């Protein structure tokens, strides 16, 4: 494919236009008075959302160079979301401000490399100062962080706080759609482990990049599955019943994995494969724990069991299973509660008998996973559109509270970054001209989140920034007053602020040092009359699709024992 090249100021200007297009769409959502954005969907009703990363992922621009700028800012939002779970809009607003200031200085003749060095020195100092300002989570802080992260929704804050009280901050908390209008909290049997799907082709929810099944069956084995013939009997049985199947094994690979992916993508089976947690004997113990939780049987080499003879009676049953790239969460059915309690008692006896600190740690982890249960927040709303938006807010609140437990809390509302900007003046004085400018680029950008929160609340952003600095307080966008935001309970997780800042500087400093942009040349649209005189004539060629019947040759897979499946 031919490429388009853009050099120097032209390339940077195009990137900045793309950055601005995306950031301007996202920034309107920041703060408790942030606006909503309506997203058209290919199928069904449009979504109304208030979530930065969801909006960012939807944006695609016509100009290939501008689109690359937008994609770079999408990367900021996605990286912040992946690592902190929240703060995507803050990261986007910071990155936009830094890109604008940085490119303006490059156009004026500043050295891009020295600017970048100055920006990196500034962020290093800010991260240190953030850690010193951070306070540990205590009292009502979990409720307050969750409320702020959900856009000031007190009910969400209460629900997340209650869920963490019931299963601890390290416990498993999931969010699902309720059958009623009310949002409710339920604690049930379940567990989570740090293994994800064996192939991204198992994803059932492209927006969240997860595979999720209701009322699924689990095939548990400590074997490696390479041959599809091992799975044919149970897969044919499940094809008739229509039940989803998740295979948790040492490894699913080669022909077996390819067959599962093909059948899933053709809609023949609802299926996914997950690598079993842990290693060696601990893997066998973990599989046994999952078997007790779900009422299944581990198909084990130690017991001379074979996969070909597996029946549906050997499979575990779950109410819901959610599989991401790195984690799996099982929400079990309640009928196995007695077996789970007996299993926990057995592990506790094992714990009493061991002297090894390492063994004790691992046994305690198993007890916590089995006994801790899963808190399920069931989200209700009058319409499907509102339900999706509310679900996104609750997930953001959960991620923010987990981040707060990890690294502590600081004053919210963009206030902490604004107050930290003063300390950069001393650093700037110690550096050469262009590095000093790099520090000042970051310094000026730190006011952007607080300014945008004020604008979204209907205030003059510059006036609010001036008052925050004069009073040495924060701006409460809900009441439009100036106060100590820590005391008012308007808090941000330190980890979220830190990662938003680091990710913004990372992308902005790279864009400042960009000299050439290479993009794919758009292909011209095919001529309308290509099919002869009759515009529908070209459709006749579709008959050639009959050749796709040759794909039935995949029925050659039938030679592997799966004729009906393929």
From Swiss-Prot:
GO BP, sorted A to Z: protein refolding
Enzyme Commission number(s): 5.6.1.7
Class of the enzyme per the UniProt entry, highest EC level: isomerase
Pfam families given in the database record: Cpn60_TCP1 (PF00118)
GO CC annotation: cytoplasm
Reaction(s) this enzyme catalyzes, per UniProt: ATP + H2O + a folded polypeptide = ADP + phosphate + an unfolded polypeptide
Residue ranges of the region described as Disordered: 520-540
Domain of life: Bacteria
Subunit structure: Forms a cylinder of 14 subunits composed of two heptameric rings stacked back-to-back. Interacts with the co-chaperonin GroES.
Protein name: Chaperonin GroEL 1
Species this protein is from: Prochlorococcus marinus (strain MIT 9313)
Gene it is expressed from: groEL1
């Amino acid at each position: 494919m031919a490429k388009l090249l853009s050099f120097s100021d032209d390339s940077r200007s195009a990137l900045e236009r793309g950055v601005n297009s995306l950031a301007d769409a996202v920034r309107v959502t920041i703060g408790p008075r942030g606006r909503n954005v309506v997203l058209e969907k290919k199928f069904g009703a449009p979504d109304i959302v208030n979530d930065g990363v969801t909006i960012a992922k939807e944006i695609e621009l016509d100009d290939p160079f501008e689109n690359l700028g937008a994609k770079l800012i999408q990367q900021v939002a996605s990286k912040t979301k992946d690592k902190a779970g929240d703060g995507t809009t803050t990261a986007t607003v910071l990155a936009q401000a830094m890109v604008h200031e940085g490119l303006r200085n490059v156009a004026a003749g500043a050295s891009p490399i020295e600017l970048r060095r100055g920006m990196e020195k500034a962020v290093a100092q800010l991260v240190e100062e953030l850690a010193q300002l951070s306070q540990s989570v205590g009292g009502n802080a979990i409720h307050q962080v969750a409320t702020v992260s959900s856009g000031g929704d007190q009910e969400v804050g209460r629900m997340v706080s209650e869920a963490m009280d019931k299963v601890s901050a390290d416990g498993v908390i999931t969010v699902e759609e309720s059958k009623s209008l009310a949002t409710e909290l339920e604690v049930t049997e379940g567990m989570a482990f740090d293994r994800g799907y064996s192939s991204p082709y198992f994803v059932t929810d492209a927006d969240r990049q997860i595979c999720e099944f209701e009322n699924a069956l689990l095939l548990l084995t400590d074997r490696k599955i390479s041959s599809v013939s091992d799975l044919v009997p149970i897969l044919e049985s499940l094809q008739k019943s229509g039940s989803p199947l998740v295979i948790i094994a040492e490894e699913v690979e080669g022909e077996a994995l390819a067959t599962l992916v093909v059948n899933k993508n053709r809609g023949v089976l609802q299926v996914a494969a997950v690598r079993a947690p842990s290693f060696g004997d601990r893997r066998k113990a973990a599989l046994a724990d999952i078997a007790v939780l779900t009422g299944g049987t581990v198909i084990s080499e130690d017991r001379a069991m074979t996969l070909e003879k597996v029946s549906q009676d050997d499979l575990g049953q779950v109410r819901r299973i959610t599989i991401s790239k790195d984690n799996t969460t099982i929400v079990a059915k309640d009928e196995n509660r007695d077996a789970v309690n007996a299993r926990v008692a057995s592990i506790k006896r094992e714990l009493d008998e061991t002297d090894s600190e390492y063994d004790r740690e691992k046994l305690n982890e198993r007890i916590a996973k089995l006994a801790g249960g899963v808190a399920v927040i069931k989200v209700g709303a009058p319409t499907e559109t509102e339900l999706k938006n509310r679900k996104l807010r609750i997930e953001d609140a959960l991620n923010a509270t987990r981040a707060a437990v990890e690294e502590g809390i600081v004053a919210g509302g963009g206030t902490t970054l604004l107050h930290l900007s003063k300390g950069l003046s001393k650093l700037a004085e110690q550096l050469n001209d262009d590095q000093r400018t790099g520090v000042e680029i970051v310094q000026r950008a730190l006011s952007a989140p607080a300014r945008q929160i004020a604008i979204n609340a209907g205030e003059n952003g510059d006036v609010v920034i001036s008052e925050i600095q004069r009073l040495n307080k924060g701006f409460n966008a809900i009441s439009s007053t100036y106060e100590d935001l820590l005391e008012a309970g308007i808090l941000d997780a330190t980890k979220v602020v830190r990662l938003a800042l680091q990710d913004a500087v990372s992308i902005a400093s790279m864009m400042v040092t960009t000299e050439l942009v290479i993009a794919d040349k758009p292909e011209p649209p095919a001529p309308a009359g290509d099919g002869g005189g009759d515009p529908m004539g070209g459709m006749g060629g579709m008959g050639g699709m009959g050749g796709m019947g040759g794909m039935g040759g995949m029925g050659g897979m039938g030679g592997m024992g799966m004729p009906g499946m393929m």
